[in-house]
C-alpha cells in the first residue's frame, strides 16, 4: 500500500490539539483553522500532508475538500510529498546568495549526495531551496525542520550535517556567535554609556 493511499486520521492527542485550534474561531468560521490543522497533520505524518489528510481536515472543518487542497498547495511550507527526517531549506534570496548560499548547496551535494528537490536514499535528509526566510542580516542561512541556522559557512554546515546524522542537536541561531541580528562587526553606535 503506497503512502498516498493510506487512510489518515488524527491521533487522539492531535485530535485534541485540532479541537483546540478550531475552538479559537467563531461559529461558522471553523474553516479558518485549516492551515493550523494542515501543519498538525504534517507533523503527525512524518513531514508531509497526503490527500487523505486534506480530506480528513476538510471533513472536520465542514469545508469543501477543494478548499483544503487550495490552501495546502498555495503555501510552500506544506509538503505534498514525503520528505526526509531533516528537511533542509536553503535560502536563495539575494542576500543569502551574495553571502554564499551556493557554497551551502554544494556542501549538501558533496556531503549528502543529493541535489535540490532530492532526498537521501536512507530518508534522512531532503534538500529544497526557498525564498527569503526573513533573517537576511544573518545571511547565509538555512532552516532545518523548525530551526534556523544563521551566519553559516560551508565548514559549519558540514559539521551540522554530521551532527544530525549522529542524532545530535546542533546549536541553533547564529553560527558565528553574534547575538540575534547584531552587526557582524560588533556594536558601532551608543558605545559611550554616558551619551544620551
Say what each PLM segment does.
Residues 1-196:
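Signature of N-terminal electron-transfer/Fe-S-associated modules in redox systems
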Amino acid at each position: 500500500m503506497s503512502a498516498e493511499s493510506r487512510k489518515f486520521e488524527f491521533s487522539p492527542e492531535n485530535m485534541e490539539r485540532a479541537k483546540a485550534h478550531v475552538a479559537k474561531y467563531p461559529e461558522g468560521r471553523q474553516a479558518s483553522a485549516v492551515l493550523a490543522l494542515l501543519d498538525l497533520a504534517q507533523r503527525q505524518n512524518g513531514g508531509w500532508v497526503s490527500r487523505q489528510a486534506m480530506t480528513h481536515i476538510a471533513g472536520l472543518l465542514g469545508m469543501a475538500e477543494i478548499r483544503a487542497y487550495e490552501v495546502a498547495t498555495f503555501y510552500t511550507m506544506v509538503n505534498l510529498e514525503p520528505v526526509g527526517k531533516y528537511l533542509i531549506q536553503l535560502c536563495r534570496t539575494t542576500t543569502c546568495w551574495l553571502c554564499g548560499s551556493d557554497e551551502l548547496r554544494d556542501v549538501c551535494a558533496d556531503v549528502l549526495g543529493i541535489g535540490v528537490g532530492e532526498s537521501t536514499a536512507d530518508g534522512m535528509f531532503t534538500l529544497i531551496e526557498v525564498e527569503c526566510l526573513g533573517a537576511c542580516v544573518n545571511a547565509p542561512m538555512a532552516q532545518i525542520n523548525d530551526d534556523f541556522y544563521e551566519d553559516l559557512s560551508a565548514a559549519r554546515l558540514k559539521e551540522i550535517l554530521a551532527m544530525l546524522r549522529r542524532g545530535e542537536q546542533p546549536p541553533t541561531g547564529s553560527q558565528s556567535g553574534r547575538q540575534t541580528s547584531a552587526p557582524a562587526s560588533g556594536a558601532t553606535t551608543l558605545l559611550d554609556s554616558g551619551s544620551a
